């Protein structure tokens, strides 16, 4: 029978003053030497209090990306108990937390960049990417007894998809954009998890050319005052990636979708808006605070994406001189220190009434892309940032945890009779 230490009392969001928090560092699973180097595009959630699940992801374990290393995809599913270690660190005033990880199973195949959402005590996973290409799989991950787990299939996606944004409204999972059959798409799918035997439904596509690396969240607690129903918030940034007759550009755009009316509303981000420099491509959202963070700097990433596009075209035309030039530029781009890339570390929200973004005061992490962020609505902690990239091609195994519940009197011990 497992013991869990539960934090009780008030909880705070990203607007709370940073000095009110205690911050701890931990590591993602270190049981495999390649996975131990850190991954991005992984799956993670807290399916029981104080018990993390982490699965899949990808990295360059043998040789860095800037030196032409091969990307490796992972299928391992790990669980880790962290809450007792946080309690101990609070008592000893330590800054590091030792999470006890176990390997409990494998995904149906090595997977990165899948859409996933925590749904009660389950993780819903859809699509993703493997070394062989994009995936159609959809399934439920659920923990069992004695470090066991089950994977229950859901209806397969209509076509292979990866890199989608996702969000839940009540029992319905939404998949927004991503790559469909290898090409960026603005299509949207939904699946009613209360009736999973049904097939995926097509929703209204978002009204924009396809974005790369969207970020989405549900405004469950901030319903649209005009309709009184929850809606999806979506942030997009990079377009023109696949279109042969267009250049890549950062067209940072905030969009909302109300499933009840099947309608989108688009808000163009002005160049002087504080969020225009970010775009949050590869970033993450906090549903509890309706805010965005993380991801790449817009101007630098546009140049890198255009270079990749030009390199592909030069190879197709057999222009060796241009290929050599672009490859040299690409290596130079990947050789800077992490700080140079300016991954976003602050939190921003979008005020629909003013049509502008605004910075939110309070706690911020180091900037990362393709990481997993758990807020207080999905974790016993006030915030947790897991893995991801610190610069293009470079992953980190670091987990950053912050909490306001560091007074030992705010913890109590309960038992989970179903977990041994």
Q: Where are the language model's segments positioned?
A:
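Sec/Tat signal peptide C-region and signal peptidase I cleavage site
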Residues: 12-16
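Kelch-like beta-propeller repeat domains
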Residues: 17-420
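Bacterial N-terminal signal peptides
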Residues: 1-9
